[in-house]
């Protein structure tokens, strides 16, 4: 009435196989070098392009290493890779954002010499009354 040897190993082996798949899927980061690093950056950044060193506005105070130092010699993740993506330049033909339109109830105040003329005109009308 014992359990056959094959069936007794089935449950632990199944668990081991599932556990190894899950751990591989949740691996937080990996090292990328050479062509693999460039291919990954092209995939992540797409049409925006990328920099090998971060733009000055994105460099943290604690480090100013380039992507090779960060991803090839150490491990890097998707968030770090995205910091090296270039921001797209807005072209004249870009119509993704509509032009700013003032609402109808926006107060319009006269400026310049016309303002002085309107002030003089209002004063003259008051004097006539």
Curated annotation (Swiss-Prot):
Residues 87-92 are annotated as: D. GO terms for biological process: embryonic placenta development; glucose metabolic process; negative regulation of muscle cell differentiation; negative regulation of transcription by RNA polymerase II; ossification; positive regulation of activated T cell proliferation; positive regulation of cell division; positive regulation of cell population proliferation. Residues 25-52 are annotated as: B. The keyword Disulfide bond applies. CDD domains: IlGF. Pfam families: Insulin. One of its GO terms (molecular function) is insulin-like growth factor receptor binding. Disulfide bonds join 33-72, 45-85, 71-76. Residues 66-86 are annotated as: A. Residues 53-65 are annotated as: C. Residues 1-24 form the signal peptide. The IGF2 locus is imprinted. Paternal inherited gene is expressed, while the maternal inherited gene is imprinted, hence silenced. This is Insulin-like growth factor 2. It comes from Neovison vison (American mink). The lineage of its organism: Eukaryota, Metazoa, Chordata, Craniata, Vertebrata.
């Amino acid at each position: 009435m014992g359990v056959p040897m094959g069936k007794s190993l089935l449950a632990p082996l199944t668990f081991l196989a599932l556990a190894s798949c899950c751990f591989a899927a949740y691996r937080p980061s990996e090292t990328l070098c050479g062509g693999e690093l460039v291919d990954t950056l092209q995939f992540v950044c797409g049409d925006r392009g990328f920099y090998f060193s971060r733009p000055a506005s994105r460099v943290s105070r604690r480090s100013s290493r380039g992507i090779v130092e960060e991803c090839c010699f150490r491990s890097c993740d998707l968030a770090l890779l995205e910091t090296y993506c270039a921001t797209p330049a807005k072209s004249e033909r870009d119509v993704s954002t509509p032009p700013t339109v003032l609402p109808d109830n926006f107060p319009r105040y006269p400026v310049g010499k016309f303002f002085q003329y309107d002030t003089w005109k209002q004063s003259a009308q008051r004097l006539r009354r």
